UniProtKB/Swiss-Prot annotation:
<keyword id="KW-0812">Transmembrane</keyword>
<protein>
    <recommendedName>
        <fullName>NADH dehydrogenase [ubiquinone] 1 alpha subcomplex subunit 3</fullName>
    </recommendedName>
</protein>
<keyword id="KW-0249">Electron transport</keyword>
<dbReference type="GO" id="GO:0005739">
    <property type="term" value="C:mitochondrion"/>
</dbReference>
<dbReference type="GO" id="GO:0006120">
    <property type="term" value="P:mitochondrial electron transport, NADH to ubiquinone"/>
</dbReference>
<dbReference type="InterPro" id="IPR026626">
    <property type="entry name" value="NDUFA3"/>
</dbReference>
<dbReference type="GO" id="GO:0005743">
    <property type="term" value="C:mitochondrial inner membrane"/>
</dbReference>
<keyword id="KW-0813">Transport</keyword>
<keyword id="KW-0496">Mitochondrion</keyword>
<comment type="subunit">
    <text>Complex I is composed of 45 different subunits.</text>
</comment>
<feature type="modified residue" description="N-acetylalanine">
    <location>
        <position position="2"/>
    </location>
</feature>
<dbReference type="Pfam" id="PF14987">
    <property type="entry name" value="NADHdh_A3"/>
</dbReference>
<feature type="region of interest" description="Disordered">
    <location>
        <begin position="56"/>
        <end position="84"/>
    </location>
</feature>
<comment type="function">
    <text>Accessory subunit of the mitochondrial membrane respiratory chain NADH dehydrogenase (Complex I), that is believed not to be involved in catalysis. Complex I functions in the transfer of electrons from NADH to the respiratory chain. The immediate electron acceptor for the enzyme is believed to be ubiquinone.</text>
</comment>
<dbReference type="GO" id="GO:0042776">
    <property type="term" value="P:proton motive force-driven mitochondrial ATP synthesis"/>
</dbReference>
<keyword id="KW-0999">Mitochondrion inner membrane</keyword>
<keyword id="KW-0679">Respiratory chain</keyword>
Length: 84
């Protein structure tokens, strides 16, 4: 089986080296990002960043889930990012 794959790759390289290189570069573009040390931090930042940003509303006192001010800290802290 490995001999057949090797023969196929040699034949492909002989006939269309540009396509082989483009497939290798595309494959590396898919495989390498999760191996990067920055991948861990980008995942942590994306988890801590709110998807929905607060909308200013007039608080009548009966809305416990609405912060009193739009800049009140809520959700996960980003202190770990400041300490890098």
């Amino acid at each position: 089986m490995a001999a057949r794959v090797g023969a196929f790759l040699k034949n492909a390289w002989d006939k269309e080296p540009v396509l082989v290189v483009s497939f290798v570069v595309g494959g590396l573009a898919v495989i390498l990002p999760p191996l990067s040390p920055y991948f861990k931090y980008s995942v942590m930042i994306n988890k801590a960043t709110p998807y929905n940003y607060p909308v200013p509303v007039r608080d009548d006192g009966n809305m416990p889930d609405v912060p009193s001010h739009p800049q009140d800290p809520q959700g996960p802290s980003l202190e770990w990012l400041k300490k890098l």
